[in-house]
Every structure is written in C-alpha cells, then in structure tokens.
C-alpha cells in the first residue's frame, strides 16, 4: 500500500441540519463512517484504522449526544489537525432557526437540549454553544434551502474529487428574497445591475440562457463590476490559500436568484476554472420561480 495521509472528516453541526445525509453521502464515497464518536476516543480510533491499513479515508460524527462534547471536541480536533500523517477536515452543517424547528416538527422529535421544553429554546442554546466550533470549521454548509439530494451533490463535489488536498471554490447564486446563505465567505450584491426580469422575452429565462447572459453582460456597469470582482479575487484567493483555508464559498445575490446572480456566478466559475481552481457552481434558488 502506498504510504499516504489518512483522510479524516469530522462531521458536526446543528441538530437537524443534515448530518444523517452527510453520513450516507460519505459512505457512498467509500468513507468508513462512525456515528456518535466520543471526542476523547477519536485519536485512538484513528490509530487503530492506520494500523489496520484497511481504509484510506474515514469520517466521524461528533455532536451533543456525546457527554462533554463542547469541552472536548475542539481540543481533540486540534490534536488530529497537527498530525503530519493525517489530512483532517472539520465539516459543520448549519441551517437557520426556522428551518431547524420545522424539521423537528415534521419528525415530531424533541430537541436534545430541551427535551421537555420548546424546540426554539434548544436550538438557541445549541447555536450559542456551537459558536466556537463553527468558527474553527474548515467547511460550513448552510442547508436551509437545500434538499437532501442537493446536499449530497455538494458533498460529492467537496469530498469526492482527487486527493482532497487542493483549495476548492464554490460559487453560489442566490436570491435575497429567500435569505442570505449562512455558509458564504464572500457575498456580492448584484441587484444594481440591469434586471432581465422586466424584459418580457427574458423574464421566464435564467442566467443559464445565453440571451440573459448577453443582456446582463452588455451593460458597461456589469463589465466594470466584473473586472473589479476578478481583481479582488486575484488578490484574495491566494491569500486564503496562504492562510491554510481549504475551501471558499463565494455567494452572488440578486433579487430572486434567477437572472443576474446566475449570470455572474456562471461567468466567474468559468474564469476561475480557466485559472486552474477546482470550482463547483451551485444555483440555490433558480428553481423557486417555476
């Protein structure tokens, strides 16, 4: 067996944000997955896996079900992160409070932190306790407006390519009317650009259609904005890589997430791919007007 780093993904996040989908997705990608791992046993488990030489990538779910979770998870994650023989990523799944409460009500489950009280109380306490953990995550995914199928596709893009060591960019379009994406590192508002929505022959098309792309990008304002955006990213992306960031989510927003944001996101994705970056394009709200 060729000596190489063992890939380790730690899956955590808000209760109800999609950890079960993440488990099944990584299993489908060939990861050996352990649910409800005690943080204090994680390094010992990793050593056993390395000694066995049976697996080259593993995932561990760590969440509040484990006693002492909030006190132990970050110190143990940092210990694993420092090891030269491991490629460790911390994945944090999130969603807004309304979505989490709705999911709990659909399943008729109580929240682990408020088994006898209001679901909202448990969600708010969990979010407060998770602040430091989320800030240390390598990858944060907001599942608020994401179907299980689309979450699986995003995880496949993140963990199914190459060796997983390269910097990875997700370019997302969205509509402000549906809420800001919680997982965005950079948010650009393009609502100031000419809006194809008011052109009858373009209204029912999207930024995936050449006619809409041409309409948006023929504007001098759009051309100038895009040049500045590219210049910004030419400085920012190498800086993020130098700081050790493994992935970056760039969110482009317009009113409904159909025309302008999709156009800019597509163009930016194509240009970043030409420069050699690994890019996934995700149009969060493009189906909502249908």
Curated annotation (Swiss-Prot):
Keywords: ATP-binding, GTP-binding, Nucleotide-binding
SUPFAM superfamilies given in the database record: P-loop containing nucleoside triphosphate hydrolases
Binding-site list for ATP: 13-20
Pfam family, one: PapZ_C
Similarity section: Belongs to the RapZ-like family.
Entries under PANTHER family matching the protein: RNASE ADAPTER PROTEIN RAPZ
HAMAP family the UniProt entry points to: RapZ_like (MF_00636)
Name listed for the protein in its UniProt record: Nucleotide-binding protein Lreu_0386
Species this protein is from: Limosilactobacillus reuteri (strain DSM 20016)
């Amino acid at each position: 067996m060729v000596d190489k780093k063992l890939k380790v993904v730690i899956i955590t996040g808000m209760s109800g944000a999609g950890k079960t989908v993440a488990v099944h997705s990584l299993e489908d990608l060939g990861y050996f997955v352990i649910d409800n791992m005690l943080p204090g046993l994680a390094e010992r488990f990793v050593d056993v896996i390395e000694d066995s030489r049976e697996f080259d990538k593993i995932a561990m779910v760590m969440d509040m079900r484990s006693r002492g979770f909030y006190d132990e998870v970050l110190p143990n994650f940092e210990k694993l992160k420092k090891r030269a023989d491991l490629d460790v990523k911390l994945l944090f799944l999130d969603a807004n409070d309304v979505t989490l409460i709705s999911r709990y009500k659909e399943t008729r489950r109580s929240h682990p932190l408020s088994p006898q009280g209001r679901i909202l109380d448990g969600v708010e306490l969990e979010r407060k306790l998770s602040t430091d953990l989320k800030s240390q995550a390598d990858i944060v995914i907001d599942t608020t407006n994401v179907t299980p199928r689309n979450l699986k596709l995003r995880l496949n893009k993140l963990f199914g390519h190459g060796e997983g060591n390269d910097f990875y960019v997700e370019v997302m379009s969205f509509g402000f009317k549906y809420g800001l994406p919680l997982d965005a590192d950079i948010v650009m508002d393009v609502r100031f650009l000419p809006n194809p929505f008011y052109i009858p022959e373009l209204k029912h098309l999207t930024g995936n259609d050449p006619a809409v792309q041409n309409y948006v990008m023929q504007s001098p304002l759009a051309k100038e904005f895009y040049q500045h955006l590219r210049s910004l990213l030419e400085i920012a992306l190498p800086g993020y890589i130098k700081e050790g960031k493994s992935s970056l989510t760039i969110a482009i927003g317009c009113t409904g997430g159909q025309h302008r944001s999709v156009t800019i996101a597509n163009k930016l994705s194509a240009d970043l791919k030409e420069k050699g970056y690994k890019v996934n394009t995700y149009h969060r709200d493009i189906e909502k007007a249908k």
